[in-house]
């Protein structure tokens, strides 16, 4: 039973510590994270996954106004 408590505490802390550092690499490139269904225009403004969450990608901030959602 103690093992379950330790496992829960570890998982809780692992997910709790993520938001403070989230998307730092994407923001440094001048981007923002969007769902993968969004098409960044021009294509050169699509930085790929970078450090965005699962099924999201990094697009340059200026391309948001031109983004097309599928």
Swiss-Prot record:
Give the disulfide map: 26-58, 33-52, 40-59
Pfam families, per this entry?
A: Myotoxins
Q: Which PROSITE patterns match?
A: MYOTOXINS_1, MYOTOXINS_2
> What tissues has this protein been observed in?
Expressed by the venom gland.
Q: Where is the major localization of this protein?
A: secreted
Supply the alphabetized keyword list: Antimicrobial, Disulfide bond, Ion channel impairing toxin, Myotoxin, Neurotoxin, Potassium channel impairing toxin, Secreted, Signal, Toxin, Voltage-gated potassium channel impairing toxin
> What is the annotated signal peptide range for this record?
1-22
Q: What is one GO biological process annotated to this record?
A: envenomation resulting in occlusion of the pore of voltage-gated potassium channel in another organism
| GO CC terms in record | extracellular region
User: Does the record's keyword annotation contain RNA-binding?
Assistant: no
Q: Where in the cell is it found?
A: Secreted
* Membrane as UniProt keyword: no
A Gene Ontology molecular function term for this protein is: toxin activity
The role this protein plays is:
Cationic peptide that possesses multiple functions. It acts as a cell-penetrating peptide (CPP), and as a potent voltage-gated potassium channel (Kv) inhibitor. It exhibits antimicrobial activities, hind limb paralysis, and severe muscle necrosis by a non-enzymatic mechanism.
Any additional notes? Answer: This myotoxin is the most abundant transcript in the venom of the specimen analyzed in PubMed:23025625.
The family note in this entry says: Belongs to the crotamine-myotoxin family.
Q: How does it assemble?
A: Monomer.
Protein name stated in the entry: Myotoxin
Q: Which organism is it from?
A: Crotalus adamanteus (Eastern diamondback rattlesnake)
Species lineage:
Eukaryota, Metazoa, Chordata, Craniata, Vertebrata
């Amino acid at each position: 039973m103690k093992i379950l408590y330790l496992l829960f505490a570890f998982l809780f802390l692992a997910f709790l510590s993520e938001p403070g550092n989230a998307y730092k690499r994407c923001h440094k490139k001048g981007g923002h994270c969007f769902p993968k269904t969004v098409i960044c225009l021009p294509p050169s403004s699509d930085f790929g996954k970078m450090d965005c969450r699962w099924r999201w990608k990094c697009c340059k901030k200026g391309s948001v106004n031109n983004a097309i959602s599928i």
